[in-house]
A protein has these predicted regions:
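Juxtamembrane helix-loop-helix junctions in multi-pass membrane proteins
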Residues: 21-52, 100-103, 171-198, 217-218, ...
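C-terminal transmembrane-helix exit sites in multi-pass transporters
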Residues: 57-58, 111-135, 271-291
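C-terminal-most transmembrane helix of multi-pass membrane proteins
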Residues: 2-3, 47, 231, 263, ...
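Specific transmembrane alpha-helical segments of multi-pass solute transporters/efflux pumps
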Residues: 23, 59-102, 108, 143, ...
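Helix-helix packing/entry segments at the starts of transmembrane helices
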Residues: 45, 104-110, 175-199, 239-279
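Transmembrane alpha-helices of multi-pass small-molecule transport proteins
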Residues: 36-87, 112-118, 167-175, 191-212, ...
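Hydrophobic transmembrane alpha-helices of multi-pass small-molecule transport proteins
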Residues: 54, 58, 126-148, 166-169, ...
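Glycine-/small-residue-enriched transmembrane alpha-helix faces in small-molecule transporters
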Residues: 1-44, 57, 82-83, 87, ...
Length: 319
């Protein structure tokens, strides 16, 4: 159970959260550096590698719970979740090739704003704090688009693809919330099939859109090219670093740190990712409009997250 008081939180939990934030924030610059590989294939490689890491945990937990523990309805939700994850990850990786790293991370991180638009459809009330947060976030996004220039690194199409990643990750998160919280599904029983299926959808997309194949001897257009000695260290890092240490670390620290604190911490991924990108390449594209709009985008997302936390407390008090 999370402790509400930071004084009761062990120091190593904060250290683990910091490591998890660094891990997930590093994924963007690593994936961007793999530009010799087409984006959809690159995304499929990442899903394949992560699924392989998750497989032992899935086998152990699935055998422990038995096949009767997962209903047909659960499998349908897992399938839908995998489609959302595939579109999210494919769109985001594509955006890394078509806009700046900072813009890609900013636009893919504003999913709390997207969730507000879906709240009426899922039976949740939209309050004034939600609306204010969305307005602040949208203002920031519009300001950030001021850095779009013909032939420049920041593009509307790249930002739009990153935003599509934000839209679709909401479906993935809602499916995960239902299966993990309401159905009490073990983490690996949920994460492995979703990740594995997402890798398949992305592989099919890479075949149809990028000319990838299973038999090609050129690793950069092979569905399993990540097993080549050149690319294996990259995918191993992405799977073990951002994939396992990042996301598993986040789930672990929730035992000691409140979900709202973890959520807000992770909203700083664009800032940390931008710094990592600057350290990696020695340069960063950061126009004046991004400097003005980026903080507003993050502020809006934080406002929505805080408002949703207040709403959860109110609903718990009523029940």
């Amino acid at each position: 159970m999370s402790e509400s008081s930071s004084s009761a939180t062990p120091l190593f939990a904060w250290a683990l959260l910091g490591v998890a934030l660094l891990a997930v924030s590093s994924a963007g610059v690593v994936l961007q550096a793999m530009s010799e590989v087409p984006p959809l294939l690159r995304a499929s490689w990442r899903m394949q590698g992560t699924a392989l890491i998750l497989l032992p945990g899935f086998v152990y937990q699935f055998r422990a719970m038995g096949s009767d523990g997962v209903s047909m309805r659960d499998w349908q939700i897992i399938l839908a979740s995998s489609v959302f994850l595939a579109i999210h990850f494919g769109a985001w990786v594509w955006s890394l090739d078509h806009t700046s790293l900072v813009h890609s991370l900013l636009f893919v991180s504003i999913h709390p704003l997207v969730l507000v638009l879906l709240m009426p459809a899922i039976g949740l009330a939209v309050r004034r704090g939600h609306i204010t947060g969305v307005m602040v976030g949208i203002t920031g996004a519009l300001l950030s688009l001021g850095d779009v220039e013909a032939g420049g690194e920041v593009t509307v199409s790249g930002d739009a693809a990153a935003f599509l990643g934000a839209v679709t990750v909401v479906g993935y998160l809602l499916a995960g919330r239902h299966l993990r919280s309401e159905r009490r599904m073990p983490i690996f029983v949920y994460a492995f099939p979703v990740t594995f299926a997402a890798g398949i959808w992305l592989a099919l997309a890479a075949i149809s859109q990028e000319g990838a194949s299973m038999t090609d001897v050129v690793p950069e257009i092979s569905l399993i090219g990540w097993t080549d000695a050149l690319w294996l260290p990259w995918i191993a890092y992405l799977s073990l670093g951002p994939g396992l240490c990042g996301h598993t670390g986040i789930n672990t620290v929730l035992r000691w740190i409140t979900p709202i604190t973890v959520s807000i911490t992770l909203l700083f991924e664009p800032v940390v990712g931008g710094i990592i990108g600057w350290l990696w390449t020695g340069e960063a594209t950061l126009g004046i409009w991004t400097v003005l709009g980026g903080p507003l985008m993050l502020t809006g997302a934080i406002m929505v997250t805080l408002e949703e936390e207040r709403g959860d407390r109110d609903r718990d008090a009523v029940s």
